[in-house]
């Protein structure tokens, strides 16, 4: 495969601070202006395929689906540049980034989606993940500019530019070490101008700069701003205050020690630093929180946003040759940089470290201890958080933080939580704390007074809602069983995705709907029956009783297909309309009525909320569907949903050829 060579001219034309930045909103503006005259649009290719044809007299040889970070759009590439296409077709595939230098639009008739035709482009890069901003998920544009008329997003979507690595490094070096001012020229034919700066004497070293009162400048001794730290800046040196220092973590399973700390410079930018094993011990004893240091040397890598909430794209791994020197200067404590996410939006950041500004609505009076599945004794304390988004979310404190937390310091107060992690369980969302979490009571930042005003004036009249992946529930447009199967719904999420279907039970086996479970509170392990006793391997004890529990598998069918689903616990109880114990008693006392209970469930249309997830079993990937809830069909709402689907389908171009 041929490589992509980027010239200095191309780099200078399209880079933004050394990175490739997409032209967010390009699709909308091109539709409004019927092309994009005089402007190049930097977009990413999501799909690409050779396809020779003609539309409205316009010949094309290639089809691509472009994304500007906000909108996606199907686009044709003109046959007029077929020679370029043949040279670069291997690159015009998913992940490539191009600059569209010439674009024309044409319509195939009233009510038909406007077509894009690229007549000029420059190939910039390849092999990128699909780019998007955390707060915006790219979506297909309908082709109707009126829907988003005037929309000009102020959103940055960018990535590193590997093909321009050498040019980027030179650019970063020039940014951190600007060239010295040029000497004024001598006046022709005689004495130098009286404004001329005398030339330095040969072989004399430059005098060191005078000491700065508030620490060295960004260019002194090669120091660069933390914001400029990237893998392409060689021999970097930064200066800042250690704003956070964690304890050394021991990982016995890997025989490893890890030490993390964060350093913040005078601009308020922060970067995370990590050291391992002997290096971790060395730097942990050297570094003190709230003191300033110079740091040089180390490997720069992509930040893992699951454990890093500094806001920096990169983090530093310290090596044996890394140098950390005391700064000597007392720097002002950096301002709290809170990248706030509203509670109503935490579902979009599941598994990531985020910041929230909230009011504690309720809190456990005391911490509680419990034993984990691994046999460890853990301590936790839960609280309920609210904000102006009218969402209510539970947060869990762990360990010492749970024990020392004082209700009077939290309840009804504005609190900033920096570095909490949203987690999903059975469709509901909560927040968890970790070693990287900071708790700041009544922080001095913008938004505090507004949040408290909302709490005192509007909150008493607001309806608070728990955040749930299923909160859309049966109100969202239903899908079909065949549609869920064909699109492998749930494959894009480790936790699975939720969908509603209108379907009926067409097959169920009463004999396997229940099992005998452990009678201990909170345990659902299947027991082993022997000599009149019931042994639970999980609890490691035998009892003279058990409890009935649901584990139902049954076939759901609609007009498009069938699928086997599983229902447990409360979800299964909603399906049957009885508790597992009630049905179990029927099995013991009246087997005919027991069987009739399940027969009555069949061939009755219901609205089902299903959790779909892809799982691997015996090296085969399968789609597993689990019942979350079930309701009677609200015919009026169902008809309304179908009408909405019909409206959404109007004007959608058939994309099967892409």
From Swiss-Prot:
One short Pfam name that applies is Rep_fac-A_C
Name one process (GO BP) from the record. telomere maintenance via telomerase
Can you provide one Gene Ontology molecular function annotated for this UniProt record? Answer: single-stranded telomeric DNA binding
Cross-referenced InterPro entries: Euk_RPA1_DBD_C, NA-bd_OB-fold, NA-bd_OB_tRNA, Rep_factor-A_C, REPA_OB_2, Rfa1
Question: Localized where?
Answer: Nucleus
Is Thylakoid given among the entry's keywords? Answer: no
What SUPFAM superfamilies does this protein's entry cite? Nucleic acid-binding proteins
Q: Which residues bind DNA?
A: 236-326
Q: Where is this region: Disordered?
A: 134-155, 169-222
Q: Which family does it belong to?
A: Belongs to the replication factor A protein 1 family.
- What is this protein's function? As part of the heterotrimeric replication protein A complex (RPA/RP-A), binds and stabilizes single-stranded DNA intermediates, that form during DNA replication or upon DNA stress. It prevents their reannealing and in parallel, recruits and activates different proteins and complexes involved in DNA metabolism. Thereby, it plays an essential role both in DNA replication and the cellular response to DNA damage.
Query: What is this protein's name?
Result: Probable replication factor A 73 kDa subunit
